[in-house]
Amino acid sequence: MSTLPWIQHLVIVPVLLPLIVGALLIPINQTRYGLKFALGIGSGLLLWMVSVALLLMADGEHWPAGIGVYLASNWAAPVGIALVVDRLTAMMLVLTSTIALAVLVFSARRWDRVGVSFHSLFQFMLMGLNGAFLTHDLFNLFVFFEVMLAASYGLVLHGYNLRRIQAGMQYIAVNLVASLLFLIGVSLIYAASGTLNIADLAGRAPALGAQDTWLLQIGATVMALAFLTKGAMWPLGFWLPTTYASASAPVGAMLVLMTKVGVYAVLRVWLAVFGAEAGGMSHFGLAALTAGGMATLLFGAIGMLSSQDGGRMAGFGAIISSGTLMAVIGHSGTAVLAAGLYYLLGSTLAMAAFMLLIELTERIRPPGSAMLALTMEAFAVEDKPEDPVGVGLPGTFTFLGLSFVVCALVISGMPPLAGFVAKFSLFHALLAASPEAVPWTTWLLIALMVVGGLAAIIALMRLGVRIFWASGVVKSPPLQVTEAASIGGLVALCMALTVQSGAVFDFLGRTTEGLLRSQDYPQRVLGEQPVQRVPQTEVPR
């Protein structure tokens, strides 16, 4: 290939676009809300379109084996930086850009005006998220994690008050320790193998000597602690409920995505490096991951039942989701992973919608409510009076109530929506994976998933009764059209995921089959050659 077709450069757009837009937003005056929102929403729309294009390319015949490789600065891997797109990466990019768009629309005329630099930090967070999904080497994964976290530190404190500052400081301290563990783990892996490229590491790991194998496993374990801290695995996820309850609604919705990055990193690295072809290190640590996932699931279920606050319930719901996904990764297999990815899609969309919905439902409750007082305190940081929150739209109670029910059903896994489809598929896949004698650990996982679902529906219905039936409020709460549109869009996607479950499962089946063909990645990543520049012929004078 003598020249690089322009369409191949789409791979780097999800990283470059938010970086450029975030930098452009910094010098713009803080009072120019309309211009900042226009740039932010324009970036979000373009990111969504690029992500969908990458998904179509990965699922089509554009790239061999459905894997696209982009060599940054035209340096070949493993020395150069390689960005890799497959079906899983593209799916996560589409999910991220979809939720980001909903959050940006929700934030218009309210949360983007409480505090400073909301849109810039939001773009830098998107850069870190997208880069973490795209990169194929461990050091750049660390770099993108830090970009994502640095932006999230500012966003968690956005619209600051005492409670938010306390939770934010805890969040920052925990993630700084996790980042240190990440860096130590990466250093140990490099000392053992001499490479940080994931595809190259997968090829070198089986040939390592006993001492280097031991060092590699220690490094992977330390690095996994960092991933699992960000993914909220018990007991490392103690920080999450308080942070969710204290963060502003748009930031809480993005934190739902950030917990999934930790789970994604474990899935990506472990399937590539410790897959079926890893020799003696095959499936290293998966039993511990399964046990930790089940413990996380139980912890989340107990936490939901004990919570009275909607934000804390959302936090424990995210912990249940992470625990389920971690336990599923431990039970590797095409059908199990496909069902797990379907569960990831449904739970993430529903949890993001629920985080946005919580703020709107707080407007129904009496002014003495602790959560409403917290929100009012956050808005009081402005020197000037706040703009009106919105108007009482017709059917507001009906819209909020139906949206709440849909989110509750999907989060808990109750029929007939996507959460139930995901859990039923997981049960079937887990039982079918052991046709002769089903291990007791599988039965325990299924039981814990049922318990987690029951705990979630009990807690959420209790919250719903308190908000919609026992609040004593007759007047419709103020609501902006943009807020209703963002929540309605996410709820509609949850419904569409249910209706189109067959097509989605077909795609996820192809995704997991590609992931389990781990030999394709070294061939594509290490086999990709730099573009040969065409020499320019000198024009005779």
Model-derived regions, located:
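Transmembrane helix-loop-helix hairpins at membrane boundaries of multipass inner-membrane proteins
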Residues: 1-12, 23-122
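Structural signature of hydrophobic alpha-helical transmembrane segments
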Residues: 6-17, 85-96, 138-151, 216-229, ...
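Alpha-helical transmembrane segments of multipass membrane proteins
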Residues: 22-27, 52, 105, 127-131, ...
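Alpha-helical multi-pass transmembrane bundles of energy-transducing inner-membrane proteins
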Residues: 31-33, 118-212, 304-374, 482
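Interfacial segments of multi-pass membrane proteins
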Residues: 155, 205, 244, 270, ...
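Cytoplasmic/organellar membrane-interface segments at the starts of transmembrane helices
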Residues: 247, 369-402, 453, 457-541
